A protein has these predicted regions:
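Sec-dependent bacterial lipoprotein signal peptides
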Residues: 1-6
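Surface-exposed, glycine-biased beta-strand/turn segments
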Residues: 14-120, 153, 162, 192-205
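Small beta-barrel nucleic-acid-binding modules, principally OB-folds
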Residues: 89-92, 131-134, 181-188
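Bacterial signal peptide processing site
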Residues: 7-12
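Zn2+-dependent peptidoglycan hydrolase active-site motif and core
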Residues: 103-147, 170-174
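A generic structural motif
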Residues: 94, 125-127, 178-180
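Conserved, short, structured surface segments that act as functional micro-motifs
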Residues: 149-205
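Generic detector of contiguous secondary-structure segments
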Residues: 55-58, 135-147, 153-162
Length: 205
């Protein structure tokens, strides 16, 4: 059995200048509307998530993005503290190294990158580009995975590992959901607690 443990602000019209010195318009995600959601379900230090956002996310019917994992096992780790005063803002899904990491939703692969914190990572968006799904500490990518690839819920994206700042003896998937605000800054959205929205067990499509 798999065990589970546990800024971008809207506004502005321009990003950094292009190589010719001209400002380039920001590519904003779908606009928000309605009342703000309860602050226990997102990180208000990063921006606002509305009740409408959460309703739309719930309608996505996400799967737990690790093969063999179940929603009931997902911990309440979103609010946990981390070093340097950071909040976790994610769910850590423990599984043996090499366990398939699955696409939580239909959507598009937007960025494949490696960094010191997340290690081997994937950024994907839902079909409406309203939400970002971030998968980190991977051991590697699925064969032929590429940017702009369309994926379906339950497709294999990669494999659980310990890359980045993950403990070498604790392979896991760091999974984060963000409300996308700027399409050019996928990493800089508003984190949303994954637990209430992972409704189906991790199974292959």
């Amino acid at each position: 059995m798999v065990l589970l443990a546990a800024s971008c602000r809207s506004g502005g019209g321009y990003t950094s200048a292009d190589p010719n010195g001209r400002p380039t318009p920001r590519r904003l995600a779908p606009a928000q509307s309605g009342a703000a959601a309860g602050a226990d379900l997102y990180d208000p230090a990063k921006g606002v998530v509305t009740v409408d956002d959460l309703d739309r996310l719930r309608q996505r019917i996400l799967v737990v993005p690790v093969l063999g994992a179940y929603p009931v096992d997902v911990p309440n780790s979103f609010l946990e503290g981390r070093s340097n005063g950071r909040r976790h803002n994610a769910a850590d899904i423990l599984a043996p190294r090499g366990t398939p990491v699955l696409s939580a939703d239909d959507g598009v692969i937007r960025r494949l990158s490696t960094n010191a914190l997340g290690g081997i990572t994937i950024y994907a968006t839902d079909p409406d580009e309203r939400f970002v799904y971030y998968y980190a500490h991977l051991d590697g990518y699925a064969p032929d995975l590429h940017v702009e690839q369309r994926v379906r819920r339950g497709d294999v994206l990669g494999y659980v590992g310990t890359t980045g700042n993950a403990p070498v003896n604790v392979p896991h998937l760091h999974f984060q959901i963000m409300r996308l605000l700027d399409r050019d800054r996928l990493w800089d959205g508003v984190p949303i607690d994954p637990k209430p929205f992972l409704q189906l067990p991790g199974a292959l499509r």
